[in-house]
Amino acid sequence: MDSIINALTSNNFQRTNTPISKPLVVHAVAGAGKTTLIQNLLPEHPNLAAQTAGSPQTPNLTGAFIRKLTCPESNKINLLDEYAALQPLKGSWDVVLADPLQHPGLALRPHFIKSVSHRLCPATTRLISKLVCPCTSSRTEESTIQFSGLFEGPLLGTVIALDQTTQALLTAHGAHFLCPTAALGLEFDTVTVVSALPLEEVADKVGLYISLSRHRSQLHVRSPPPHPSH
């Protein structure tokens, strides 16, 4: 367990005032590196076993990879990624990790948190901070972020429809789209988010957060004004 806590500290996860208990709870925003941290720990520590309630890694020859969720392994320190997808959490896990902003259920009180994203650009984290929850970016380069009215711009890249109104509209026009839950865990170079409401009026903060954090290079938003500053 010391190796895990040392890795969290060295990767700038911040200790909270919650007393250490089992399971050790780690929360991080999208792109903060929690899954990468697990990936880096596994080859060096054969006493660790990692599973995920999200998308498992491809198996490799070493056996050091994040597996699909089954149950904790005996005689191992067991880590569970994306635990917040499970309601309720079951099993005797030693460490559980998640971005709780991507799931609607109640999360556990964390022992470590990280609100700095290495994938999302500063403009994106400012936008998410304004609309959902405070976070920052370690990047210096900006992505392209562009807003226009619902019918005033093209649908570029992967389209994410935030609500039933826009989903029905896109379906009627034969346009392919994802709902926020289908986009969970995925990344795309270019994303267009479509909303029937101004983003500041969207009540589904989980869906909004997922939608605004899927792009790598370009984010386009098609929604009624006013459009948030970023």
From Swiss-Prot:
The entry sums up its family as follows: Belongs to the Tymovirales TGBp1 protein family.
On subunit structure and binding partners, the annotation says: Homodimer and homooligomer. Interacts with capsid protein. Interacts with host AGO1; this interaction targets the host protein for degradation, thereby suppressing the antiviral RNA silencing.
Which InterPro entries does the record match to this protein?
Answer: (+)RNA_virus_helicase_core_dom (IPR027351)
Q: Which residues form the (+)RNA virus helicase ATP-binding domain?
A: 1-114
Q: Could you state a single Gene Ontology molecular function term? A: RNA binding
Q: Which GO terms describe its cellular component?
A: host cell cytoplasm
Other information: TGBp1, TGBp2 and TGBp3 seem to act together for cell-to-cell propagation. TGBp1 is the main movement protein that physically cross the plasmodesma with the viral genome. TGBp2 and TGBp3 would facilitate TGBp1 function.
- Functional note: Transports viral genome to neighboring plant cells directly through plasmosdesmata, without any budding. The movement protein allows efficient cell to cell propagation, by bypassing the host cell wall barrier. Increases plasmodesma size exclusion limit. Acts as a suppressor of RNA-mediated gene silencing, also known as post-transcriptional gene silencing (PTGS), a mechanism of plant viral defense that limits the accumulation of viral RNAs.
Pfam family of this protein, just one? Answer: Viral_helicase1
Q: Name one GO biological process term.
A: symbiont-mediated suppression of host innate immune response
This chain's protein is named Movement and silencing protein TGBp1
